[in-house]
Amino acid sequence: MLSLVLTVFFVHVAIYLVNTIGASTIDSLLWLLYLKLPTPTSRTARKQQQLKRQVLEQKHEMNSTSSQDEFAKWAKARRRHDKSMEEYEALNKTLTAQKSSFDWTVKIARWLSTNGLKIFLQFWYSKTPVFPLPEAWFPYYVEWIVSFPRAPLGSVSIHVWSNVCATTIALTAEVMGALLVQIVGQKKEQRETAPVSAEGKKAQ
């Protein structure tokens, strides 16, 4: 079983990833993955896509047929198109309702597994020391601050550890992002200067 130290840390990693990537992006990705599963919803989605292609093909056929010179053929194509369009719109409404229900379920599950879990842990373990401080290393006021609000004096409370994790993760991600941008910029600069150097040697 994970210790309280790692549990709180991983919860904050999850919260940071959700906030960075974006809840809507995660919801869309999970929806696409859900549609890959053998469920009634995925079958509805496949049928909707088939009808969409069928509607476009029938519309193209109808537009390429003259309503004056070939009225009977055009009218038949129009009836087929209208029927397919009705089926497509009905399936689209069904799929939209299913997606709304899916998004709501995912939203609840995401909150419970991130912020909800964080709040629960802070409440449930409010009096539990996350880890003890070395004896006589810190003055009284420091021990009081890091044990705030309800942990035993001389230990780190879950509230303080939670804030430390959130700050550390955010700063680490920011530093890594800055380093990545710098590395990519240097490589791009090297690629741009390489052809210039080669042309200079040829000219000599």
UniProtKB/Swiss-Prot annotation:
Q: Which Pfam families match?
A: CHD5
Which stretches of this protein does UniProt put in the Lumenal compartment? 1-4, 132-155
Coarsely, its chief localization is endoplasmic reticulum
Q: Which residues lie on this side of the membrane: Cytoplasmic?
A: 25-110, 173-204
Q: Does the keyword Coiled coil apply?
A: yes
**Coiled coil region boundaries:** 43-99
PANTHER family, A to Z: GUIDED ENTRY OF TAIL-ANCHORED PROTEINS FACTOR 1, TAIL-ANCHORED PROTEIN INSERTION RECEPTOR WRB
> HAMAP family attached here?
Get1 (MF_03113)
How is this protein organized at the quaternary level? Answer: Interacts with get3.
The identity of this protein, by name, is Protein get1
Q: Which organism is it from?
A: Penicillium rubens (strain ATCC 28089 / DSM 1075 / NRRL 1951 / Wisconsin 54-1255)
